[in-house]
Amino acid sequence: MARIILTAPLFYFFFSLLSHQTMSQPQHMHTFCSVDSFTQTSSYETNRNILLTTLSLTSSLVHYLNATIGLSPDTVYGMFLCRGDINTTSCSDCVQTAAIEIATNCTLNKRAFIYYDECMVRYSNVSFFSEFESKPVIVRYSLRSAPNSNRFNQTLSNKLDQLIPNVSPSTLIPYFVEDQERVTQLEGSYDLVSMIQCSPDLDPSNCTICLRFAYATVSTCCGVPSSALIFTPKCILRYRTFVLPSPAPSPSSLPPISPTSSPPLSLPPQLPPPLSQPPPPLST
């Protein structure tokens, strides 16, 4: 099971069930549409639609793109960001679906976000490039508690300390790092699979701030879940845990078998000694 937490001041939430959605399609998490709007058939609408088409067409090539369409006052700024652990086909499917739905759900809204479990798409009448943004945030997390929950937050924090310095524009997928580690503790062992990702328009300092914010969001809102996926406007944090079965005890660790003495054998009662001569015959 999963639960979703969202924070969206200055935005209202618009939810649409996709009647055509199948299991192979990306999972829609939430859509946020701004209150301010534009008029139908305006230059802003034309630029918005061109922007969304541009994002859709480019998503088969890269995991991230930002774009600017049109002249002031009708300029539209937009971007998409796909999770780095999915392939370009899945990225393209997600962005194309998101672009259609954001235009449908936020028909005349000047600003909008749409979050899927594999990507996010947004557009705005105000430039947002190179800036850290904390809202809106979406968190999907497991209702199961993390293994060794008393120590898990520290374990995850330490893992972030290790991964964040490795976020770099020179990686195969820019600003994306993933890791798998086996954690062994007295309470038991588990595999911790982690991924962090920043929008490439962020500098390293703002990337670190964004990832720390994402971690703080899940650790304060949701207890100690065994898995979580956090989307912010500029970064993604995901982790999962897989508990390992307890190993069977080795023979050397089994308690020794205590020797037991066998009960004494019981002998049959002693027979009377044999007669020295046969008894006389009976008289008739």
From Swiss-Prot:
Pfam families: Stress-antifung
Superkingdom of the organism of origin: Eukaryota
Example of a GO cellular component annotation carried by this entry: extracellular region
Domain Gnk2-homologous: 26-128, 134-244
Cleavable signal peptide: 1-24
Protein's cellular compartments: Secreted
Keywords attached to this entry: Repeat, Secreted, Signal
Main location class: secreted
Keyword Transmembrane helix carried by entry: no
InterPro entries for the chain: GNK2, GNK2_sf
Spans through the membrane: none
Family: Belongs to the cysteine-rich repeat secretory protein family.
Name of the molecule in the record: Putative cysteine-rich repeat secretory protein 7
Native species: Arabidopsis thaliana
